[in-house]
Amino acid sequence: MAAKDIRFGEDARARMVRGVNVLANAVKATLGPKGRNVVLEKSFGAPTITKDGVSVAKEIELADKFENMGAQMVKEVASKTSDNAGDGTTTATVLAQALIREGMKAVAAGMNPMDLKRGIDKAVTSAVEELKKISKPCSTSKEIAQVGSISANSDTDIGELIAKAMDKVGKEGVITVEEGSGLENELDVVEGMQFDRGYLSPYFINNPQSMQAELEDPFILLHDKKISNVRDLLPILEGVAKAGKPLLIVAEDVEGEALATLVVNTIRGIVKVCAVKAPGFGDRRKAMLEDMAILTGGTVISEEVGLSLEKATINDLGRAKKVQVSKENTTIIDGAGDTADIEARIKQIKAQIEETTSDYDREKLQERVAKLAGGVAVIKVGAATEVEMKEKKARVEDALHATRAAVEEGIVPGGGVALIRAKAAIAELKGANEDQNHGIAIALRAMEAPLREIVTNAGDEPSVVLNRVAEGTGAFGYNAANGEFGDMIEFGILDPTKVTRSALQNAASIAGLMITTEAMVAEAPKKEEPAAPGGGMGGMGGMDF
């Protein structure tokens, strides 16, 4: 086992604080409407330019191991806040730095670290309660657009695009962000259930303009096995032909004789058919077929439930108003399933979302909910260069997370005002002893830090602005974009409650741990062994070359 380098007490804490300050100073430069950009070197390709706090934090590694530990702990604040609420990373870092800086001073002055931590925790718990009281629900399109704009660094186009997407697919709907091909941002909305499987044969195409197979009012056959024998399909094909309707077949695969027969029937116009593979794999495929069955009012023909293809009748098939099948995707629009059944299925999937621990599974389950609930919106981000595209895409994703958080827990006045109001409401809070009172005072002082930093970045005097905001009430605050004072909600400067709450809680959590640190252990630096001197063979002097 390698030797360790151990630091204690004041020496350990001072090094840790140096690391915290390096990271926080780089991150906090990005805060507010007049925050600056940070340029990040990449090992290959052009550097990345960003105004996103968590992107800056993730890039920082320090040479000194003890300083690096401090920086990494604050990085955890930023990434945790980003994971929880999708935004507020810079605010969380600024709060953590303020708490740590003041807390370390108090520890150096001889106060009890545990009591300081208890005081900070008490103040934060009360402040969170106050934030919940100040919070207003975020329901209108205008408010959603404002939250999105603020999170996307005051880009109103992005805010409006997100509000439009939420209008189209509902608050529960899935909104994805992709890189577009033009200069403008675009919004594509896919109504109904879409999955990423296309037609099995181009002969199924019946609309040469769009190169799609379009089926109006079709029957839908759902099967979880391969179909290769045409005899299995005959009873259903005859029933569908009698009804004079088209047929969509969704199965694990359709091959050989069965596929050839379907193609011939389609070309001759006997029955209009299109066959596609079922989406997903394994258990997820079964679940998605079941979703389709509920959406279309049909049954999955599966041996597990005692149904076989040759015994299936037209009554086992699902129905929909329209189906569009392209080379890559299939979209089922307006399925004929019972609304109560669909809602029960959504409820069931939401329960699974609550229980799952895997981010990947959660994302897939949320997609399934959206497909059942009514659609998927795709925001295509446009930009002139790849560097701008990456930066813009990151901002759109941030804004999307923030608007979801706002819909979930409501909104508070932005620009650091909510924390000032929460601070005023708990100004009289007292702890069990003097050290706890000092911990409370540290937390109250730290709650001013985001507003101070926004004002500093805008080039104004923080103390003057802070006093003016503190004298006001409600949503009265300072608009750093134009230097005006007024109602933050009317200015459209809003923060999701969840973002402000998560930033404060995560900052206090890490600050409490760092204040109560007494020793730090790191790998001792290895001594470089001097290289052996190079030598030739002896007795070779005087040779002429």
Curated annotation (Swiss-Prot):
CDD domains: GroEL. Pfam families: Cpn60_TCP1. It is found in: Cytoplasm. It is an enzyme of class 5 (isomerase). Together with its co-chaperonin GroES, plays an essential role in assisting protein folding. The GroEL-GroES system forms a nano-cage that allows encapsulation of the non-native substrate proteins and provides a physical environment optimized to promote and accelerate protein folding. Forms a cylinder of 14 subunits composed of two heptameric rings stacked back-to-back. Interacts with the co-chaperonin GroES. Belongs to the chaperonin (HSP60) family. This is Chaperonin GroEL 2. The lineage of its organism: Bacteria, Pseudomonadati, Pseudomonadota, Gammaproteobacteria, Enterobacterales. The gene is groEL2.
